[in-house]
Amino acid sequence: MSFTPGKQSSSRASSGNRSGNGILKWADQSDQSRNVQTRGRRVQSKQTATSQQPSGGTVVPYYSWFSGITQFQKGKEFEFAEGQGVPIAPGVPSTEAKGYWYRHNRRSFKTADGNQRQLLPRWYFYYLGTGPHAKDQYGTDIDGVFWVASNQADINTPADIVDRDPSSDEAIPTRFPPGTVLPQGYYIEGSGRSAPNSRSTSRAPNRAPSAGSRSRANSGNRTSTPGVTPDMADQIASLVLAKLGKDATKPQQVTKQTAKEVRQKILNKPRQKRSPNKQCTVQQCFGKRGPNQNFGGGEMLKLGTSDPQFPILAELAPTAGAFFFGSRLELAKVQNLSGNPDEPQKDVYELRYNGAIRFDSTLSGFETIMKVLNQNLNAYQHQEDGMMNISPKPQRQRGQKNGQVENDNVSVAAPKSRVQQNKSRELTAEDISLLKKMDEPYTEDTSEI
């Protein structure tokens, strides 16, 4: 019989939660003399932040049943004491509480100063016989893997746990039995980095004056879970808006004044630093389209970088290094046509460049990129052709009323009805019969009814 975490109530797990002499502890509260026996298996290598892959992040290949544990302090080791480290899951007996923590190396990101910063790793728990190391035996020395098991579990057989289907089963917030010591410098996803608050609640039962208060405090700590609430993102957004002095309940409207300010702010930047958007269009930033500026048409000229198709084009844009070192550059002095003639004239230079961006059909989104490029390259030519094919609307002369046309300087009023059109047609037999009756003399009908 396979077990599904969170699907059944486990009396053994519940009784285990009620037993014990305390709740979850933190590493800075633990005693120096901890039981770190190995039960006959090899000592696990300590997993540190320095052992993560230096080149970017890796993809978690399998779905864990529990939320992750994230490192927030460098140089801290991820480890649990003997018999600890297996999360609590309703429906899973203690005999199946065995598995390993898998280190997920997250990708790096670029900071404001242009440097690459590597995110600290995040650890996910998988039951023995599941996950990325399903075929490995318990205790195998693997970089980025830390084996854990309860004292009642048989580590020689895989755990009888089904794999999680993310479409039907949500991840369970990670919780541990009472007395578990978390690795220092780590926090459970969804619980925040509130270690001081957790330590204060852990000490609260010890400071309580009676056993009853300790029981009530422990009961409250048992029922609370560090899961992510649905409105947590809204609360964070409200706090950020409050710091900025804005009301989160009122929608931010872009008025003509704010749009004008945004447009002026963009136009005050140098030409090569402008980013056109809804408030400042492409033509306002860079002028009309032509042979020297031949990209853009339709909605992209109106929306600029706000166009939904623009981000995929931005993937083709060269970096600053590729621009300077991968292009042919030429410095030329040009005539200064701007400025007040009374002011001192400035020397104006142009850094002209000539290069190419090479890509092939293996590029992600290749078909979409080709479609967008074909729609916007030299689009101004098609627009001009379309304008030439459309006959211009005749302009109405001043003082001329609608519905009048001029022919040889004679104004003829437009007909207002079919009767006024006065179209000639031949008389039918019915018409002739009616005319004859009209010519006959009138005779009064004297017949009685």
UniProtKB/Swiss-Prot annotation:
It is found in: Virion; Host endoplasmic reticulum-Golgi intermediate compartment; Host Golgi apparatus. Residues 61-190 form the CoV N NTD domain. SUPFAM superfamilies: Coronavirus RNA-binding domain, Nucleocapsid protein dimerization domain. Residues 29-38, 45-55, 194-204, 212-227, 400-410 have a biased composition (Polar residues). Residues 9-22 have a biased composition (Low complexity). Its main location: virion. Residues 52-194 are annotated as: RNA-binding. RNA binds at residues 106, 122, 164. Residues 423-440 have a biased composition (Basic and acidic residues). Residues 266-276 have a biased composition (Basic residues). GO terms for cellular component: host cell endoplasmic reticulum-Golgi intermediate compartment; host cell Golgi apparatus; ribonucleoprotein complex; viral nucleocapsid. ADP-ribosylated. The ADP-ribosylation is retained in the virion during infection. Phosphorylated on serine and threonine residues. Residues 266-385 are annotated as: Dimerization. CDD domains: CoV_N-CTD (cd21595), CoV_N-NTD (cd21554). Pfam families: CoV_nucleocap. The modification Phosphoserine is found at residues 167, 191, 391, 424. Residues 1-55, 158-231, 266-297, 387-449 are annotated as: Disordered. Residues 259-384 form the CoV N CTD domain. Keywords: ADP-ribosylation, Host Golgi apparatus, Phosphoprotein, Ribonucleoprotein, RNA-binding, Transcription, Transcription regulation, Viral nucleoprotein, Virion. The modification Phosphothreonine is found at residues 174, 428. GO terms for molecular function: RNA binding. Homooligomer. Both monomeric and oligomeric forms interact with RNA. Interacts with protein M. Interacts with NSP3; this interaction serves to tether the genome to the newly translated replicase-transcriptase complex at a very early stage of infection. Belongs to the betacoronavirus nucleocapsid protein family. Packages the positive strand viral genome RNA into a helical ribonucleocapsid (RNP) and plays a fundamental role during virion assembly through its interactions with the viral genome and membrane protein M. Plays an important role in enhancing the efficiency of subgenomic viral RNA transcription as well as viral replication. This is Nucleoprotein. It comes from Porcine hemagglutinating encephalomyelitis virus (strain 67N).
